[in-house]
Each structure stands twice: as C-alpha cells, then as structure tokens.
Amino acid sequence: MRQTKTGILLANLGTPDSPTPEAVKRYLKQFLSDRRVVDTSRLLWWPLLRGVILPLRSPRVAKLYASVWMEGGSPLMVYSRQQQQALAQRLPETPVALGMSYGSPSLESAVDELLAEHVDHIVVLPLYPQFSCSTVGAVWDELARILARKRSIPGISFIRDYADNHDYINALANSVRASFAKHGEPDLLLLSYHGIPQRYADEGDDYPQRCRTTTRELASALGMAPEKVMMTFQSRFGREPWLMPYTDETLKMLGEKGVGHIQVMCPGFAADCLETLEEIAEQNREVFLGAGGKKYEYIPALNATPEHIEMMANLVAAYR
C-alpha cells in the first residue's frame, strides 16, 4: 500500500507588494471585494469602493506601510516567510508552502507548489488563532474555488482554529512573562484582537467567543486576576458597529482614569503586520500617553520564534 505524502499549506491574509499607492490600491481592491470581508450589496459597494475608498485610502495607507516596511518586504511577508522556512526545517520530510488570501503568493500558487511535490494530502493551517468567517472562512472559500478547477484533488485536512491550543497559550504566556521581566509588571495587560462587524457575530460567527476563550486561558496560564487582563477590539472600518470595547477608546479612557502602565498584546495576529506595528505599537501608544498614561509597551507577535514553530509542528502532526 502506497504511503500518503502530506504537504502543509500555511495561509494568511496578505499584503501589498510594495508601499506605494498603486500596489496598496491593487491589494485593497482584492481584499475589500471579498464578500467574506464586506458583504454589502454590490450595487451599493462597487461605486463606493472604486470611486471613493480606493482613491482616498490608498495613498494614506501606503504611507503607513512605508513607515513599517522592512528590507525583505512588508513585516507580514517577512515573518510569514520566516515561519514557512522554519517549519520546513523542523519537518524536513514535509513540503511547506505559503499562500495568501489576497496578493502574492496566492493560495492557488501554494496549492500548485504542493501538488508539484506530488503530495496527495494537504494540511491547511490558516494562521488565525481564532476562527472568523471573514478570515478562516475566506481561506476555505478560495481553497474550494481552486480545487473546483482541478481534475484530481488531494485529501484536505483543514484546521479551523487553535484558540485554546495548549502550546499556543503557553507560547503567548511565555512572551508576556518575558515582557514583564523586561519592563516590570503593568497595571493592566490589554489583549487587543482584530474586530469584526457586530452583525457578523449576531448572525453566527463565533469569533468573539473564541477570543474570550484565548483571553481566559492566557490569564489562567499567567495566574493573573481577571481585573488585571482586559480584552478589546481594534481596526474597525466603516460606519456600522463593530465588536466592542474598541481598543483606542479604551486606552484613552484608561489613561484619563489614571492607569499608569499598560502592556498590549495582540494574540490574534500570528505575525506582526501594519495593524500591530503601526496601529498598536505607535498610534495607540500616542492615544494612551496623550490621555495621561505614563508607560506603554507593545508585546510582539509570536512570529517565527522557536516556540511558535514548535506549536505549528505539533498542531499539524495530528493530521499528517
């Protein structure tokens, strides 16, 4: 009996190819055209997207990307490539490909890369610790579209999320402990997750519950009292209500109330990116300090740390 050959597909959101208005416009057009991300009526959404949002938003967002751009590309791409390479080194007999929902390298190129290695089973690991229809769901949709065009398809194991995975929680906890050891224990540990429209949760997306699960498990692993850990949501877009409390408004309120020292972690981001390095580490630092706070540190994402790579290896091992 022939032994099954397994490949691993690491999936993440994506990034512009360069910090220019043109590249950002291409990326945002693809991203904001996905119904999993924005499900507004196309009749209303297309004119708004093409006539207002892309022309106005692309130059501004390009400047933000330029402020965090690294020698090897955007932070998300640099750290994602490091994750892919480190996992491939950890699992030398298993092909590992990287694919993005939007931009390059695409999910389709990742699937084709694995099929060229003659794999007949693919373990898909979306690097979103907490499930959401707007992220993990988008990977599922695109994977289905890709495979629908194939005459022969491999077996697929799809990891929905890992919000309460023991290795993941321990890696987060060790990262927090290292920050506390370096900067001192703060008055409050704030866990900021990417937001989604409240309507998505009302319609069945269990993302907020998965975020609460991670928050609870991390606080327990750290032995911290509930009042010392707070969960908020960032990066809202558009006018409809998103999950609350909002990170920026919470930081302003805490600074005004006299909270002096805060450390912020973003457990929902497997790799540092614009939303962590610019929005959280820079913009929200200014919000907190400007409101009266005294000390603010951002705790980096797990990125390609050995603990994170070991977590990935253990996570996919059950499906190989």
Curated annotation (Swiss-Prot):
Catalytic activity: heme b + 2 H(+) = protoporphyrin IX + Fe(2+)
Localisation: Cytoplasm
This protein's name: Ferrochelatase
Gene Ontology terms: cellular component: cytoplasm
Biological or metabolic pathway of the protein: Porphyrin-containing compound metabolism; protoheme biosynthesis; protoheme from protoporphyrin-IX: step 1/1
Binding sites annotated in the UniProt record for Fe cation: H194, E275
Keyword Ribosomal protein: no
GO terms assigned for molecular function: ferrochelatase activity; metal ion binding
Gene transcribed to yield this protein: hemH
Record SUPFAM superfamilies: Chelatase (SSF53800)
Function as written in the Swiss-Prot or TrEMBL entry: Catalyzes the ferrous insertion into protoporphyrin IX.
GO biological process, one term: heme biosynthetic process
Keywords: Cytoplasm, Heme biosynthesis, Iron, Lyase, Metal-binding, Porphyrin biosynthesis
Subunit (UniProt): Monomer.
Organism: Shigella dysenteriae serotype 1 (strain Sd197)
EC number from the UniProt entry: 4.98.1.1
Family: Belongs to the ferrochelatase family.
Gene3D superfamilies, per database record: 3.40.50.1400
